[in-house]
Every structure is written in C-alpha cells, then in structure tokens.
C-alpha cells in the first residue's frame, strides 16, 4: 500500500510467495497484489514449487512460460527460472534427469536441494535474447529467484560460471536482481550490479528496493531494512569539495591533497565513485576527520577545534614513497591506521597492530607537536632496470570480517608507495561492506608500471591455502565439501587448467587450518603444478632452508616465493617488513608474471628492504645450464645504504662461499667468482644481516646444472577416487611430519607410478 503512493513503472515479486505449507498461500498473496496500482511481474521460487507444479504456477501468475521478457523505459527485462534444472523440475522430464545426473557427476560440490541451474537449452535462449537486445541497442536487466552473486558463497545457481561467461559477452547487461538468499546481498562485477533483496519474512518491517535506472547509473532506494546504494556504468574520476578553515590542508586517505584557498574552499579529485576518508590540518588546530565520505560529494564541512602547539609539516618525495615519521618518537601514521580515524567498525585495540607507515604520492602533509624525524624507506630503482619486479599474490585489503574499513584505491596507493609493481589481493571487500568490482578497479588503477588484480585464495580450507597468479577473478569458484575433494583436484580444475599458476601459501605455518597438507602429494603427482613454495611466510617457520634443500636434492626444481598476507585490520600493509616476491620478466604483464613463476625466475625479500640476485654467465634464477666447465657466478645485493650484509652461495645444500659486503650509498653491493662445474647440481644465494642472526633477509631461487644423465623424480598417478585413509592421514600430520623426507615413502606406498 505504501508503494502505491510512489511513482513506479512496475513491481517485481522475486519468488517464494509462501512457505509451501498450504496450497492456498499463493492465491491469498495474489489477492494482496491485486490491490497494487502498478503492474506486478512474478518470478517463481523454490517454496512456490512445494505445493504447485510448473503448469499450476504459470496459471496462477498468468504466464505462458516461466522464462519471459518484457520492456519498460526502453530497457529489456529478462526473467529466468533459476530452478529450471532442479528437484522442482517436472518428475520424469529431461530436466529432472539432468538434475540427477549433475549431482552424480559433482559429488564433491555442496549442491543444496533448494537451488538449481539452467538447462543448456535455456542458456541458449538467454544468449539469443541478449543478442537481440544488443542489436536493438537496448540495455538489459535480468531477474531470477536464485542469484548469481551475493554475500554467501553457496546461495546461487549451480551453473553461475557458465551464465556469467555469457553475460560477459554483452556490455548492455546492467543488473541482475534476485531473492532466495534471505539476508540479501550486493555485489558489483564487470559493470553489472548484482542485488539480492532481503526476504520480508526475515525483516521486522516491510522491506523492498526501489530501483531508479538512469542513462549513466543505477540507484537503489532502500525501503524498510534495505539500504541505499549507487552504481555508475562507467567509472571515472570524481570530485570531493567543500569548506574548511582558510589555508587548511585537505588530505584524502588515498594520498590526494590540496590546500584550501583564502575563503576556505577546497576541491580534490579521487579515482572513482566510492567511499573515502578526508582529513583537514592547520597550524594551531586539531586534525579534523570525515571518515566515510561517499564520492562524488559537495558542500563538505570540517569542524576544526583549537589545539595550540600543533603545526603542519609539508614536504615532497621523489614520486611514490614509503616514509617512517616520528613526532617526539611516536609514529605518525597515515590516517592513524591502528584506530578509528579512517572509519573502523570497532574500537581500537581489537585485532589491530600499530602501523608505522606513512605513504606519499610525491607530496605529503601531516601535523605534529614535537621533534619530527622523517626517514625514507629504501627504494631500489635499479632492480626494475634489470627487469626484476616486486609483487605479492597473497594479500588482503582486510580480512573477510571487514572490521577495518579499507578500500581498493587506498590499497593500491599503499602498494605503489611501498614500491610494488604487481599485486594480487586475496580479498576485495570495499569499505561499504560491498565487495568491489574486480575488473573495474583493476582497469582503473593498473597501468604500465603497476598491475593490480583482485582475486581470492582458492582453495582455502583445512588442507591448506593456495594463492594463484593469472586469474583476474575466480567467479567459477564453487562451494565444495573440502573433506570430499583434495586441493590438488580443485587447483588442477580451476587454476592450472586455466593456464594460471598456483602456489601453496604458508605451507608450514602452524595456525589452525593454515598448514599445507598436500605439498608432497603435489610433487609426487604433478611437480609442475608446484613450481614455487612460500617458504619464508613467517620468520619462526621451522627451518625452511633445510626443507628447501631436501626437495632440491631430490631433483625437484623449486623456486622460492614470499608473501605479506598484508591486511589493514591487523596493521600490515604489503611492505610492512613482510615478504614479497620478485619476478624476472621482459615486461610487466600478467602473462609474463605467470611464466616467470612457472619457470622459477623468482627471488624474495623477507623484510627490511633486502634483495639478492644470482646469475651464472648472465643467466638468472630458474635457468637450466649444462655442467660443462668454467662459469662466472655473480651475486648482487640491495639493502640499506652503508649497512654490512652477509651473502651465502649455496651449492646442493652446502655453503660454497660466504662473504661480507658493505652496501654503497644506493644500498648496492656485488661480487663475482669463477666456478668450475661438471656435475648435476644447483646453486642459490642468501642475504643475511649480521645484526639479525638466524634470519634470512632475501633469497634467490636456484640456477640448475643438468645434463642427459640427470634423472627427474618419479611421477605417480593421482588416485581417483582419493582414498579416505590417505586423506585422513594427511590431515592428521603435524608441521614437523609435513617437512620430513620420510613422508615421500609413506605416500608412495599408496600411489601407482605413472607410465
């Protein structure tokens, strides 16, 4: 009745008009809808099928088919039956048989009995409708009971990967509205708004979404327990403007800054529509914050309270830079990243670690009261000149809980200031609790000198966590029973077969559910699927070098990677004295990074800005050379200017040479030596700080010598189905057992050699 007072083109009922307990439920609800002054469109839900057949539902809703289209406002609306192939399909029908077959063929998937999918015929129908709308230059909005994307990882159509692939071909698709998942959800993907409307039965008041469609955007007006939101079709820079005290410096959390004019007016440009944080600073005034500003925005106002003795410090850096700033010894943090200033959802102290990072795009401003000291963290431009590029494939903006309100532009800014060239984020939550649009952000924030991808760890379960490089997204990710399928099978299906590369992350970290249980299994059954290992995730890992040397001496080619597991909610940003992986590539492209990791052309820093490169006759890590006599070995290091470093050249697990070098004014040092190599073997290089005994600051992956006599490790068939007793054995192993060479023999007893 309240909606009758609003100007609407039509109303859509997204399904489940009743609980399915009584055949009279739907007719009773239809009597209520009959009082609407607006046309009502109907979508069938799983509860509607409980007491009614498809034919009965078509009659009740006045439909010729449960798939149909209609036009309004020049937009083509396509209504889908997301339960086309499901337990609700007509008994004895071809579609019901397909439902039973699909369950048998996917025993490891969590296929809920109240979800479903489209038949191949229905997907062809959908493609034809989209094709026709595109020819007629019409935008399209799709409607279904069962969603494609929402905040829950399991409440969606079983064939969502196939449907999303179809939608990707048609840029005129603008939105997908659904019900089914009672808590609701909102997500943007490739410029398509996916909105799951909350179920009225779970709300304390009448709830709906009113959708306003414009030429450049879609606005959702929340009604009841639904909230407002907005999605622009095309992303471009927008402005934040308003007033502060004259001469104030206005800084955005993403690094943009401007000084207010004599009248106090300011205006600055940010990357795209979204939610940002602003800070105003002026001599003699306390810092003033606007922590959750939705851009674009006008008429913003700061309340700047007096604070005698506070002063503004303004300066410049040589492009993007990471600074360590103290005020009488206390860190000056970028937006106080251990507290509420950027808009945390909880009080300081929960999860937080103090961050000491301050980032600059080339110009910086902060306020202080005491003695200020500014230190610029090392930046080794010569590494880029040698085509070694710094990156990470296991980082988070925040963890899934979203306790800390990070956003994608802030993360890209921090990564660039910490001199990352490429970055894969394992989580991509926006600071509005809406998952970010991965493709839109990566297109907007990537460039020739910085590659950003928003993805996820997958698989991630009690068998271990797997990072991946080369997949811009994992929309094909499906809910699965991790006790019924191995990470090996999931990685092979969704990552390796797609041409991407996977790396088990922190395989020897002892946290609950964090340990990689399958490393030996991967090496035995598919060693090329495990080209590198994340060995230096945590400095307290038990003896990673001995484990690495053991695998190399068995004949495996194992490169090294290191990751940051960076996340704002724990005060860690990518370079916060955490790990990073360098790759050697001819140019900074995603395809080149994938090939570098596959070919073990990697080196790592584990903190404090150190790096080391190893080359033999000009061939870097990953190279395979013939053991044919004399060669020139070169070791290059990067560390803090003036610092003494210890370099180790390791041959087949034994230290061949150890040298102390003094870093020059740019932090560089190097040496060369002659070697005479006539055997199958490997060399790698380590960098240590004499003041930090026992800690590896950097490592270069091996260079290998191999001739025709070299015998690769035996490869074994992966057992299908995977034996339950073998799965149980792996899951019960301790970190120490997972690093013990004897595990190879225990596994081989269950495997068959590959012919």
Region locations from a protein language model:
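Extended active-site neighborhood of metal-dependent phosphoesterases/phosphodiesterases
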Residues: 23-136, 162-172, 186-222, 438-455
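Long luminal/extracellular ectodomains of secretory-pathway precursor proteins
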Residues: 232-392, 397-417, 423-449, 453, ...
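C-terminal functional module detector
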Residues: 296-305, 309-314, 318-328, 335-383, ...
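A short C-terminal boundary segment appended to hydrolase-like catalytic domains
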Residues: 212-249, 262-264, 604-606, 619-628, ...
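Catalytic cores of extracellular degradative/oxidative enzymes
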Residues: 37, 41-46, 55-62, 72, ...
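N-terminal active-site segment of His-dependent metallophosphoesterases
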Residues: 1-28, 390-396
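Binuclear metal-dependent phosphoesterase catalytic core
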Residues: 70, 184-239, 567-612, 616
């Amino acid at each position: 009745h309240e909606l009758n007072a609003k100007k609407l083109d039509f109303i859509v009922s997204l399904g489940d008009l009743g609980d399915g307990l009584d055949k009279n439920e739907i007719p009773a609800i239809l009597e209520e809808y009959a009082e609407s002054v607006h046309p009502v469109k109907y979508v069938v839900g799983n509860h509607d099928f409980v007491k009614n057949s498809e034919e009965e539902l078509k009659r009740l809703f006045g439909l010729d088919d449960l798939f149909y289209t209609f036009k309004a406002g020049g937009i083509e609306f396509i209504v889908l039956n997301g339960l086309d192939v499901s337990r609700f399909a007509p008994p004895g029908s071809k579609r019901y048989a397909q439902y039973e077959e699909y369950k048998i063929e996917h025993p490891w998937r969590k296929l809920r009995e109240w979800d479903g999918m489209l038949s191949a015929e229905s997907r062809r129908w959908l493609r034809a409708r989209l094709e026709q709308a595109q020819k007629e230059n019409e935008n399209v909005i799709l409607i279904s009971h069962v969603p494609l994307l929402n905040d829950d990882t399991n409440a969606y159509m079983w064939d969502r990967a196939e449907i999303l692939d179809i939608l990707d071909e048609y840029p005129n698709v603008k939105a997908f509205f659904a019900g089914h998942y009672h808590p609701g959800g909102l997500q943007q993907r490739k410029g398509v708004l996916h909105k799951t409307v909350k179920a009225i039965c779970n709300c304390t008041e009448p709830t709906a979404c009113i959708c306003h469609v414009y030429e450049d955007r879609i606005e959702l007006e929340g009604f009841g327990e639904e909230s407002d939101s907005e999605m622009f079709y095309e992303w471009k820079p927008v402005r934040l403007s308003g007033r502060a005290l004259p001469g104030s410096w206005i800084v955005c959390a993403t690094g943009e800054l401007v000084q207010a004019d004599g009248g106090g007016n300011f205006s600055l440009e940010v990357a795209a529509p979204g939610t940002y944080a602003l800070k105003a600073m002026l001599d003699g005034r306390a810092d003033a914050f606007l922590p959750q500003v939705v851009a674009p925005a006008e008429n913003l106002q700061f309340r700047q309270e007096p604070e005698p003795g506070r002063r503004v410090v303004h300066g410049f850096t040589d492009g993007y830079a990471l600074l360590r700033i103290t005020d009488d010894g206390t860190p000056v943090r970028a937006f106080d990243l251990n507290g509420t200033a950027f808009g945390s959802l909880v009080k300081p102290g929960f999860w937080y670690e103090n961050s000491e990072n301050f980032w600059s795009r080339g110009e910086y401003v902060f306020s202080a009261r005491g003695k200020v000291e500014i230190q610029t963290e090392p930046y080794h431009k010569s590494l880029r000149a040698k085509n070694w590029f710094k990156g990470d494939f296991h980082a988070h903006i925040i963890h899934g809980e979203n306790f800390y309100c990070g956003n994608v532009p802030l993360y890209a800014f921090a990564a660039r200031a910490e001199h990352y060239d490429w970055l894969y984020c394992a989580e991509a939550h926006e600071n509005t609790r809406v998952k970010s649009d991965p493709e839109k952000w990566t297109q907007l924030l990537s460039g020739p000198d910085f590659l950003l991808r928003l993805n996820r760890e997958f698989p991630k379960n009690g068998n271990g966590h797997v990072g991946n490089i080369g997949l811009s997204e994992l929309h094909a990710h499906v809910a699965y029973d991790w006790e019924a399928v191995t990470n090996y099978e999931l990685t092979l299906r969704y990552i390796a077969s797609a041409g991407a590369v996977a790396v088990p992350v922190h395989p020897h970290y002892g946290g609950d559910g964090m340990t990689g249980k399958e490393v030996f299994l991967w090496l035995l059954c598919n060693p090329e699927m495990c080209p590198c290992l994340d060995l230096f995730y945590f400095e307290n890992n038990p003896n990673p070098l001995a484990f690495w040397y053991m695998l190399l001496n068995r004949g495996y080619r194992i490169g090294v990677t290191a990751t940051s597991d960076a996340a704002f909610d724990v005060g860690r940003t990518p370079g916060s004295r955490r790990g990073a992986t360098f790759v050697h590539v001819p140019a900074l492209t995603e395809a080149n990074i994938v090939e570098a990791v596959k070919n073990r052309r990697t080196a790592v820093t584990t903190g404090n800005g150190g790096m080391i490169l190893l080359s033999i006759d000009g061939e870097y890590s990953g190279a395979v050379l013939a053991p044919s006599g004399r060669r020139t070995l070169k070791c290059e290091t990067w560390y803090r200017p003036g610092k003494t470093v210890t370099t180790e050249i390791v041959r087949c697990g034994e230290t061949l040479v150890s040298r102390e070098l003094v870093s020059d004014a740019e932090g560089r040092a190097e040496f060369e030596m002659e070697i005479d190599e006539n055997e199958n073997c490997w060399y790698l290089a380590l960098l240590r700080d004499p003041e930090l005994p026992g800690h590896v600051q950097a490592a270069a992956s091996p260079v290998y010598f191999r001739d025709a006599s070299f015998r690769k490790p035996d490869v074994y068939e992966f057992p299908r189905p995977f034996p339950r007793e073998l799965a149980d054995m792996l899951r019960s192993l301790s970190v120490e057992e997972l690093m013990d060479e004897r595990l190879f023999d225990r596994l081989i007893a269950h495997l068959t050699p590959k012919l």
